[in-house]
Amino acid sequence: MSNFTHINASGEANMVDVSAKQETVREARAEAFVHMAPETLKLIVSGSHHKGDVFATARIAGIQAAKKTWDLIPLCHPLLLTKVEVQLEAIEAENMVRIESVCKLTGKTGVEMEALTAASVAALTIYDMCKAVQKDMVISQVRLLEKTGGKSGHFKADA
């Protein structure tokens, strides 16, 4: 269990002490997909969904979620994010929406969880806004795409 940084020698969960770590610029990108029927995607893209602008709402939800990650994930540190960006793209040929989030800060711990939370909550918001139209949408492939900064260095997911 000693390989898990959030577990102490007694096997108890603890927030990692990052006070001695150096501050570095850290950035993370994550993605998620929401698969849906062509008719549902057309409602979103055309802006004719009765609940309003689905992409704008999902974008704001993702940004808000990144800022509250420490409140949602028990052992995450509260972070002073300097950038949160959420982009949504309708891929009509595949009947899905791709969400990509970017989080950045100068700090002592990474922003991977914030980027993953932003993409996840944006996807959940799309589901919430469209569930009256389609209940069998699928959220998939939530993953970290890239992270930079910190002691562990650069990570880039395989394409």
UniProtKB/Swiss-Prot annotation:
Q: Where does substrate bind?
A: L75, C76, H77, M113, E114
In its keyword annotation, does this UniProt entry include Lyase?
yes
Its UniProt pathway annotation is: Cofactor biosynthesis; molybdopterin biosynthesis
What reaction gets catalysed by this protein? (8S)-3',8-cyclo-7,8-dihydroguanosine 5'-triphosphate = cyclic pyranopterin phosphate + diphosphate
Q: Which Pfam families match?
A: MoaC
MF-aspect GO terms: cyclic pyranopterin monophosphate synthase activity; GTP 3',8'-cyclase activity
GO BP terms: namely: Mo-molybdopterin cofactor biosynthetic process
Q: Which UniProt keywords apply?
A: Lyase, Molybdenum cofactor biosynthesis
Q: Which PANTHER family match?
A: MOLYBDENUM COFACTOR BIOSYNTHESIS PROTEIN 1, MOLYBDOPTERIN COFACTOR SYNTHESIS PROTEIN A
Looking up NCBIfam families in the UniProt record yields: moaC, PRK09364.1
Task: Give the protein's biological function.
Answer: Catalyzes the conversion of (8S)-3',8-cyclo-7,8-dihydroguanosine 5'-triphosphate to cyclic pyranopterin monophosphate (cPMP).
User: Which family is this protein grouped under?
Assistant: Belongs to the MoaC family.
The protein in question is named Cyclic pyranopterin monophosphate synthase
Gene designation per UniProt: moaC
